[in-house]
UniProtKB/Swiss-Prot annotation:
Main enzyme class: transferase
EC number: 2.4.99.28
Entry keyword set: Cell inner membrane, Cell membrane, Cell shape, Cell wall biogenesis/degradation, Glycosyltransferase, Membrane, Peptidoglycan synthesis, Transferase, Transmembrane, Transmembrane helix
Protein name per Swiss-Prot or TrEMBL: Biosynthetic peptidoglycan transglycosylase
Sequence intervals crossing the membrane: 19-39
The keyword Membrane is annotated on this UniProt entry: yes
Stretches of the chain forming a coiled coil according to its record: none
InterPro entries: Glyco_trans_51, Lysozyme-like_dom_sf, PBP_transglycosylase, Pep_trsgly
Length: 242
């Protein structure tokens, strides 16, 4: 290998190592800070806002109203757990059984990819990372998830998740969603309304709370059944998530 190529390789390696250190400090500091401090915005919110501006849409506003868990209906927390991650109180960030099922499904159905991200993983991804699918992003997501699970309580993870989750075009967080779609605060959401909001979470830009399709209604009904099977509202109290 020539001297010039060695020099370039060495420069790139040093640059990447320094970048990794900077990102580790940035993300580690963010995890520590947001364990107690309110989250002002998420990476997904920034990405959506910048994308809108770049496409000339200056009327778009990524809107979120931060609320604490005692300002959120317990039905809402139960609904997202029933819909997205039923082992949330027990796992350390990853649901191995769901991952194995998703891998088996994806091998059989290449055109219908199924995910297995837990609420903890989704929180890490939405808060700190860019959208998309790659092994690099998945690796970073795994590291951030472990950091969040180590430092934050389960209640804190669920609170942040509910405050940054996307429920529609420009609608981030359960308070903004409750006001937009039901004209009430998140604390007043009913069991059925919470299940409907949770039903669009797989793809909130495709599935609409304001105009639910047959699939969304079917998923809402399934979520309601799962909420009942989990034990209803006492489930949240039992796991100290309310």
């Amino acid at each position: 290998m020539s001297k010039s190529r060695l020099t370039v390789f060495s420069f790139v390696r040093r640059f990447l190592l320094r970048l990794m250190v900077v990102l580790a400090v940035f993300w580690g500091g963010g995890i520590a800070l947001f364990s107690v401090a309110p989250v002002p915005f998420s990476a997904v919110m920034v990405e959506r806002q910048v994308s809108a501006w770049l496409h000339g849409n200056f009327r778009y506003v990524a809107h979120s109203d931060r609320v604490s868990m005692d300002q959120i209906s317990p039905w809402m927390g139960l609904a997202v757990i029933a819909a997205e991650d039923q082992t949330f109180p027990e796992h350390w960030g990853f649901d191995v059984a769901s991952i194995e099922k998703a891998l088996a499904h994806n091998e059989r159905n290449e055109n219908r990819i199924r995910g297995a991200s837990t609420i903890s993983q989704q929180t890490a991804k939405n808060l700190f990372l860019w959208d998309g699918r790659s092994w690099v992003r998945k690796g970073l997501e795994a590291g951030l998830t472990l950091g969040i699970e180590t430092v934050w309580s389960k209640k804190r993870i669920l609170t942040v998740y509910l405050n940054i989750a996307e429920f529609g075009d420009g609608v981030f967080g359960v308070e903004a969603a409750a006001q937009r779609y039901f004209h009430k605060p998140a604390s007043k959401l009913t069991r059925s309304e919470a299940a409907l909001l949770a039903a669009v979470l797989p793809n909130p830009l495709r599935f609409k709370v304001s105009a639910p399709s047959g699939y969304v209604r079917s998923r809402q009904a399934w979520i309601l059944r799962q909420m009942y099977q989990l034990g209803g509202e006492p489930f949240m109290q039992q796991h100290q998530l309310d």
